Structures are given as structure tokens and as C-alpha cells.
Amino acid sequence: MRHRNGNRKLNRTSSHRAAMLRNMANSLLTHEAIVTTLPKAKELRRVVEPLITLGKKPSLANRRLAFDRTRDRDVVVKLFGDLGPRFTARNGGYVRVLKYGFRKGDNAPLALVELVDKPAAE
């Protein structure tokens, strides 16, 4: 029985799902906004929010945890240098998921995933 099983399978093996979510989290933290399907976006939010919470407390242990989860040094540097200090006053809810229409090929529902306190576009 699937009672209380929390994560979506997204029709992938566990290793593929973990790699996909890691790559999407790296893209979101790098670009601060991405477009993906709605179920992937909702699952991505569960990956990124704890990472930003780690970035708010700059310790060596937290840096190592963040690197273990992202496997990307540039993302870790941005997380602790830019994103962590930006969200110090906010207690969670760092990621916004907005519905974004439907994909042309298969009519899959799309979502725009973005960080809440994005700097103004130039």
C-alpha cells in the first residue's frame, strides 16, 4: 500500500529521479527561474527549500552538506554568498511555483519556478 509515501515517482527510477532533481535544483539556484512541468516543479520545491535554509547558516558542515546534495561548487558558492544572506529574514517559502500554460507537443501542464526575492530585472 502507498499510504503516506511522500514523493512523486515521475515515471523514473530512483537514481534517475535524484539526478534530474539535482540538475534542476542547480539550474534554479544558478538562473533563479526555470520552466518545467507542474509535477516536477512541485517536487523541485521540496529539494531547493532545504538547500536555501542550509545557505542561511554559513558553516563548514553546511557547505559540505550543500555540496553533497548539489555536487556543484559554483552553486554552493552562490548559495552561501548570495542566496543565504538574501533570505535571512524569511522563514521558508523561498520558491514560487506559478502555472505557466501547457506544453505544445503533449499538452503537459507547465510551471514557472522562481525564487521569491529575485533582484529586479535590468
Swiss-Prot record:
Keyword Translocase: no
Molecular-function annotations in GO: structural constituent of ribosome
Assembly with partners or alone: Part of the 50S ribosomal subunit. Contacts protein L32.
Key words of the record: Ribonucleoprotein, Ribosomal protein
Annotated signal peptide: none
InterPro entries (UniProt xref): Ribosomal_bL17, Ribosomal_bL17_CS, Ribosomal_bL17_sf
One of the GO biological process terms: translation
Record bears the keyword Ligase: no
The protein, known as: Large ribosomal subunit protein bL17
Protein family membership: Belongs to the bacterial ribosomal protein bL17 family.
Record Pfam families: Ribosomal_L17
NCBIfam families xrefs: L17 (TIGR00059)
Protein species of origin: Neisseria meningitidis serogroup B (strain ATCC BAA-335 / MC58)
Cellular component terms per the entry's GO annotation: cytosolic large ribosomal subunit
